Amino acid sequence: MMRTLFKSKIHRATVTQADLHYVGSVTVDAALMEAADLLPGELVHIVDIDNGARLETYVIEGERGSGVIGINGAAAHLVHPGDLVILISYAQVDDAEARAFVPRVVHVDADNRIVALGSDASAPVPGSRTERSPQAVVAGG
C-alpha cells in the first residue's frame, strides 16, 4: 500500500510578487527550495493564511537569497503581494517508509529568511504569536 504524506512546508512565507500574465507556477528562492527539499517542477499546495484560498501548482526556482515567493498566472487572482502563505509538498511512500518518515518544516521571517528548521508540523513559528493546537500530540511526548 502507498500512502501520501506531508513531506515538507515553508511556513508563513510572505508573497513578494504576483504576475497574472505569467504562464503559471510559484517562483521560490532556491535556498528555501533546498531547505524544504523541493525540486523545480514539483507539485505544491499553497494555502493563503490571509484569505483562506487554497491552490496547487508547481515550483520554479528563484534567485538564491532573494526571498522571492512569486505567485504566477491565474493564481494571482487569489494570492497577492504581502499575503502570508504556506507552501506544502507531499510524498507517496510505502507503508514501511511512512512509519519512519520525517518531514521538513521551514520557518521564515517577514523577509522569507530561514529562522528555524524542524520536522514537527504543528510546532509554533519561533518569535511569532502562533500556537500549537491544544489537541495536537507532540511527537515523542
UniProtKB/Swiss-Prot annotation:
TM stretches of this protein: none
Required cofactor names: pyruvate
Entry GO terms, CC: cytosol
Note on cofactor: Binds 1 pyruvoyl group covalently per subunit.
Modified residues annotated as Pyruvic acid (Ser) in this record: S25
One MF annotation (Gene Ontology) recorded for this entry: aspartate 1-decarboxylase activity
Protein keywords: Autocatalytic cleavage, Cytoplasm, Decarboxylase, Lyase, Pantothenate biosynthesis, Pyruvate, Schiff base, Zymogen
InterPro entries xref list: Asp_de-COase-like_dom_sf (IPR009010), Asp_decarbox (IPR003190)
Pathway connected to this protein: Cofactor biosynthesis; (R)-pantothenate biosynthesis; beta-alanine from L-aspartate: step 1/1
Annotated positions binding substrate: T57, G73, A74, A75
Catalytic class of the enzyme: lyase
Post-translational modification comment from the UniProt entry: Is synthesized initially as an inactive proenzyme, which is activated by self-cleavage at a specific serine bond to produce a beta-subunit with a hydroxyl group at its C-terminus and an alpha-subunit with a pyruvoyl group at its N-terminus.
Domain of life assignment: Bacteria
The protein's Enzyme Commission number: 4.1.1.11
Annotated catalytic residues: S25, Y58
Protein family (similarity comment): Belongs to the PanD family.
Function: Catalyzes the pyruvoyl-dependent decarboxylation of aspartate to produce beta-alanine.
Protein name: Aspartate 1-decarboxylase
Source organism: Streptomyces griseus subsp. griseus (strain JCM 4626 / CBS 651.72 / NBRC 13350 / KCC S-0626 / ISP 5235)
